[in-house]
Amino acid sequence: MRQSEVGAANAVQIERINDLWAYVLPDDKLVTGSSYGNKKCFANSKATGAIENLFSLDLGRNVIGSTLIRYYDAESGILLEQTGSGDFIIHPAYQKHKFKLARGLRISEIFYVPNAPQDNLDKCPAAYLGLKIVNKTSEVQKIAAVAYSDLRPTYLATTPDAEVRFAYKNKVIIASNRSNEQWTRFFGTTAENAVCSYTTDISAVNDNFNVTPRLVSSCGKYIGIDFSAEHCSVQYVPLTTESSTTDSAALNTEDRTIIGRIQVDIEVPVGGEKQFTFIVGFSPTSGEDALQTFELLEDYEQAYKLTINNFVHETSYSVVTTPDQVINRGVQWAKANMARVKAEYPQGWGFTNDPSLSSNIVARDTAWFSFGCDYVAPEFSKQALKVFKRLQSADGLIAEYYNGVTGDVDDYQLTINDDTPLYILAVVHTFQISDDRVFLEEMYPSVAKAADYVISQKDERGLIFCRSDGVGVYGICGWRNIIPNYAINGAVTEVNAECFAALRAVALLADYMGADERAAYFRAEATKLKNAINKHLINPKSGLYYLNVDLNGNEHPDVTCDQIFPVIFNVATPATSHLIIDRLNRPDFLTTAGLRTVPRTALNYHPERGWGLTGGIWPDVAFMFAYSCSTHQPDVMINIMRGTFRQYELDPTNQNTVPGQFSEWYHGESLVNNGMKLSPWFPPKYLWTAVEGVCGISLHRGLHINPNLPLIWKWVSLSNMPYHGSAVTYFACWVKGRLDIFANYPFSTSLKNAQTELDDDISALIHERLEEIHLVALATPSHVVICIGNMTASSTSFTFSVSEITETYMTPGRYRVRVFHSEIDDWYDQGVRENSNIHGFSVGLEVGGFKLIELTKQVT
């Protein structure tokens, strides 16, 4: 299936490939390539499809630089260049570049990082650059595919003393650092008859002639000289098995780039194809381990298949399905982005806020990540939070970040921060979804200590007060902490709102622990804090909250995006919440790309200063704003979620994005991305907004479902949500003016609706599927409800069999069959039949509509 945005000023197509949504676009429309990672590495690519770097999470350094492939005529050595425009396929698991060479050969280069639990592929610090050559011409084609790799990168890299050691089995170049010989890189191929060499001349990659010893005799007639080694523009050192270390007398490598080179000569028959791969990788422990990793990765087809399957698996959890395919894709890609950055550092599980540039793991980001990650991989959330527990200060403060490699901790000398309450909230959220009592018992002392510390920072008014008098990270205790020469200290509304929610949350954990007195204490402190916030931090002139009341008692009435925090954390009254949402929903704040951090009409607005924190657009703030609108204005929530993800899909050339990747921040006027191409903590916020905002999931003392449907929607669904060791699926729809909810797990709701609790999700027993049709089948052996939703922009029909349900699941007997038609908002009774006579259904579906098919066993 292929989709495109009508009237869009770009050529991005949307396709379903390998059971996931992917993007297809001309290869001249990217300004940067995709990014992929696993537990031990992260790799970026360029707009050309070349690998840009391989970053080791164990070292926190780039270990291999750019890797690319060039093509030459095998007899003359003349460079064969791309002809015409090619295509990129941007898939959650890989990036494929398809193009033609001068002779009409069709090339596919595929870049991916192995990421699957089988054989610990997700712990292999390596990247593939695969190659498929198809000959559609009328002649046998002989070409040389030559891959080059920078084995001594300098940007954020190890010490520049990597040396080439030898070529293992004549197809893998081995290099290691002189100062740390255990740090071993490999650059190899699965192709037969490879020739390995290296050079210190970076111009080799740009040479229009492929000059190797086997071509010496024929090069003269092409370059017009009596060819000899002295005339060669690039000097290579050939490598053989177990060669000695680099001979500096033969080729001086001191302080010079080292370019590994692997040549594969290929003869492609008419109508035939050749396929193999190049692999770059690293071991922080030994050359032997590096070679074992390479040999594991040689089965590249299996690694490719398992990596795709793993992404399909990761995205199968908490599937949010709505009539709006843009939001559906956004949720899928959010989970795919998260799967690329979940890592295992020397210090433990976590993720950096700046992949391939930093190893710092921020508590704030980890907390927000867990709110979304809990709906996909709660075990990762647990392990990531446990690291912060281990590094917690003696007084209870949670530091701003730790370094995942060294374990160094920095709290920026703040007396209070947003990290501490967010850590508490994250631990509680993870416990609520997992019901893991071992995790609770391990983490409760830490969160209670953190809560006690929060309370200790109250001032005489009962407000949480930051006494740090610095600027930037040393004087801003909230999330916008990297604004230079700026302070947000004292009583900060953002942090106070988070602390209220944290104290209320830790009271809940105290209840579970049977610590009744502590629970009552935390609950009372939370109530007092909320009252103090609404007494001292509301601006009587505007009815909105102050940004902060600083160390000198000055009230800062700045209206910024931070107004969302009292709404999100239930500090604001309904009336104040409506006032805040209305203010943020105005054009000087809200754009098609997201929410400006400071309104365009403010005196201190600037579209890009301070990393966009004084007027730029941070999409994750828009996700939080969308969540805050969920119960007040769901139509606004949906428009924001749709618009922000479309910004990630459309026009990557002008917006400096990669389709499907959640980039960081935009210029407040041009809406062009100025930040990182994949911001790790944005995707989980989008997922969190979809699950808790759109689908209305709440975890407080049990499962609550209160969907927030905009006026234009008739249904919404959530499938396979992890909860207390089970998988929750529900379908909610408007039936005769009432929102009916069908679910396979006991739940409560505050809506005036009909609840139908069934035992099992038996959707897998219906095998017919259409990409634009959503189907959920929930049942007990005597009661089956099949829910079918239309996601297309037109009316459609769908035919499917239920024979496996009626023959293997349902209790034998007579069943009344009813069908609900959304277009007429009424049920149609199809009579009573024996289950053996119920074989299938064919339904018509209106735009955005649904059908319910109910089979109820009759009592005789």
Give names to the regions the model predicted:
Residues 2-63, 338, 358-361, 413-430, ...:
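C-terminal capping/lid segments that line or modulate ligand- or cofactor-binding pockets
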Residues 321-360, 383-415, 456-491, 531-619, ...:
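Extended glycan-interaction surfaces of carbohydrate-active proteins
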Residues 135, 174-175, 266-268, 274, ...:
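Aromatic-rich carbohydrate-recognition surfaces in CAZymes
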Residues 141-144, 185, 265-289, 846-855:
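Short Pro-Gly-centered flexible turn/kink motifs
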Residues 63-65, 72-110, 115-117, 627-829, ...:
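Non-catalytic C-terminal accessory modules of carbohydrate-active enzymes
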Residues 107-243, 260-262, 302-310, 317, ...:
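Polysaccharide-binding surfaces and accessory modules of carbohydrate-active proteins
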Residues 2-102, 184-241, 307-319, 323, ...:
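An extended acidic
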Residues 430-442, 505-521:
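Inter-helical turn/loop segments and adjacent helix faces that build the functional surface
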